């Protein structure tokens, strides 16, 4: 009785007592545990990869949609001052070439600030770069088309920072087709990458490979960076907000355009093949304490590139870097003085003849 009670009863099999080979049972149970896990892991991995790819593509697509502008644009504001200047100075025009990262809309603001001084010599226009990147040939074609339509034979260039480099290359090309470039004004323009004080210039080559694939994320970072790097008298918070605002402005430049501008800057002046005659005046407009461009090095560089051309230097202290839209009165006076020196205005009255 005692021995019988101590013997345990055999366990009941889950399928009602069917006998199964012992060596197959563990294999069956392992199979049951693993089969559902493997597809689930693959499914989750596939979904994660798809989500990442979608987010990446959406990021780039959003950046493109935000900045869609496929052609270079020449814009001549239709206002009374420009019409009056066109009547006074037929066959002449100004072209403002914007700087690095300056949007089409901001280029218009810069022109508006400078137009009263520009109109003392010619009507004023500004250029909008294409978001596909800097292409001097296409930019030249856009300007050539505009000069043909308006019958322009004399051009004045205002180069806003980076725009001074582009103006230099374009001026030589325009001279080849018979259009004379009377004056080029360098508004805070570096003469080479060595003049640039921004330490990030060391990463231009890397940026050329990486930046075009950053989309909106890169746009946000670039906005903060540009705002803090060029506050123009604003506090850190206001400068960062302004930078982000410019970066996400629908008229803002694409990251691809900014990257090609940077690589163009790094290579300059190798793109310049000469062709600018010694009669073309070179205006040099700088804040001596510019924190983006070393003004002294830039001036020396331009004078070395154009040793036979007339130069005139005008300092605009405490204005920061390339900021006519922020300090319009200062820039108008400066531009007026430069033009009076390099391109004296035509006489409107007969000079007084001395008695003796």
What are these model-derived regions, one by one?
Residues 232-311:
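Serine-hydrolase catalytic core
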């Amino acid at each position: 009785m005692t021995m019988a009670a101590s013997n345990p009863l055999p366990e009941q099999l889950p399928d009602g007592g069917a006998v199964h080979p012992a060596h197959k049972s563990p294999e069956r149970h392992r199979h049951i545990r693993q089969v559902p896990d493997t597809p689930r892991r693959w499914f989750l991995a596939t979904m994660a990869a798809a989500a990442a790819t979608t987010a990446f593509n959406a990021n780039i697509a959003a950046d493109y949609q935000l900045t869609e502008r496929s052609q270079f644009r020449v814009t001549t504001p239709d206002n009374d001052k420009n019409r009056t200047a066109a009547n006074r100075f037929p066959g002449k025009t100004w072209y403002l070439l914007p700087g690095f990262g300056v949007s089409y809309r901001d280029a218009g603001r810069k022109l508006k600030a400078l137009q009263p001084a520009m109109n003392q010599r010619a009507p004023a226009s500004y250029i909008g770069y294409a978001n596909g990147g800097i292409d001097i040939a296409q930019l030249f074609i856009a300007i050539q088309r505009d000069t043909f339509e308006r019958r322009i034979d004399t051009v004045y260039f205002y180069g806003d920072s980076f725009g001074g480099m582009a103006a230099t290359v374009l001026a030589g090309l325009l001279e080849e087709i018979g259009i004379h470039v009377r004056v080029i004004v360098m508004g805070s323009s570096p003469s080479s990458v060595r003049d640039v004080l921004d330490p990030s210039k060391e990463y231009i080559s890397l940026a050329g490979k990486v930046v075009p694939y950053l989309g909106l994320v890169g746009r946000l970072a670039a906005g903060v960076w540009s705002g803090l790097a060029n506050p123009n008298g604003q506090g850190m918070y206001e400068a960062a907000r302004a930078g982000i605002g410019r970066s996400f402005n629908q008229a803002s430049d694409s990251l691809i355009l900014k990257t090609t501008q940077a690589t163009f800057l790094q290579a300059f002046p190798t793109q310049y093949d000469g062709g600018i005659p010694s009669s073309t005046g070179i205006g040099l407009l700088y804040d001596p304490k510019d924190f983006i461009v070393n003004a002294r090095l830039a001036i020396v560089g331009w004078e070395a590139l154009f040793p036979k051309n007339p130069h005139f230097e005008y300092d605009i202290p405490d204005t920061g870097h390339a900021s006519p839209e922020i300090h319009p009165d200062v820039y108008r006076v400066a531009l007026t003085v430069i033009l009076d020196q390099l391109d004296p205005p035509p006489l409107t009255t007969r000079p007084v003849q001395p008695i003796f």
